[in-house]
Amino acid sequence: MAALQTLREWIGIQQFPPATQSKLLEILGKYKEEDVSSLTVLVMGKGGVGKSSTVNSVIGEKAAAVSTFQSEGLRPTLVSRTRSGFTLNIIDTPGLIEGGYVNDQAINIIKRFLLNMTIDVLLYVDRLDVYRVDDLDRQVVGAITDAFGKEIWKKSALVLTHAQFSPPDGLNYNHFVSKRSNALLKVIQTGAQLKKQDLQGFSIPVILVENSGRCHKNESDEKILPCGTSWIPNLFNKITEISFNGNKAIHVDKKLVEGPNPNERGKKLIPLMFAFQYLLVMKPLVRAIKSDVSRESKPAWELRDSGLASRRS
């Protein structure tokens, strides 16, 4: 379980330009209107995709350690900030791939870290400037689904970092973004085993992010995407939409962390085992015994006694 932390005032918001601050405070006002006092955002994905950098960009300070040339640690980081009575919790997690495979130990550590917490939003992070998806992507999505259930994807967004990216060979930027996004969304759909009925009434939003210092800015000094969108307020807007989308948040209880109790599962199987034994073993055996008894010839004394009885009658 995550260690309790002393709540810190969200002073990083003051590092944003006034235009961004104004938009963020307006978004926080929506939570106040709905009488919501806290929000918990879980950030997951492979290593090296920009999870920690995104957390720092959102908070406006270096709250999560960024390890560019070193392997990530296994322990998640909880970053909590409060502003005007509202608490924002962001959980930065380690990469889920180790040696070309999903790191089950990392998954288990994350689950135990989240014990008794409620996930309001999942940010699944990957890079925009990657040209293909592979089986590892499906494995990561499958591992997240196995850990928290497929319903978590109804509270999720796909975040693509390195958005200040020039596609090769003169490809149209919007076309490349659409192609990359659709490829990853398809991986999420197949990896999470989402059926058509699961997808009715909701879609996973795609959010572009640029964490580097070379991110372009508008006349209000806000960091913008190539399309001109101020991406930090846009990210907060999408998070807010997801938190209020009507789907249930994911509560991480002991059952979710440890899985079903094998003893309870065994108790449920006992009646089935007895029924199976009776139908396939005992019942045919009893039937066979009765059949043998009926076919067995009667002894002489029984025939004599039955003959005397018939003459007397």
Swiss-Prot record:
Induction: Induced in light but repressed in darkness. Residues 92-95 are annotated as: G3. Residues 161-164 are annotated as: G4. This is Translocase of chloroplast 34, chloroplastic. The gene is TOC34. It is found in: Plastid, Chloroplast outer membrane. It comes from Arabidopsis thaliana (Mouse-ear cress). A motif (AKR2A-binding sequence (ABS) required for chloroplast outer envelope membrane targeting) lies at residues 287-295. The lineage of its organism: Eukaryota, Viridiplantae, Streptophyta, Embryophyta, Tracheophyta. One of its GO terms (cellular component) is plasma membrane.
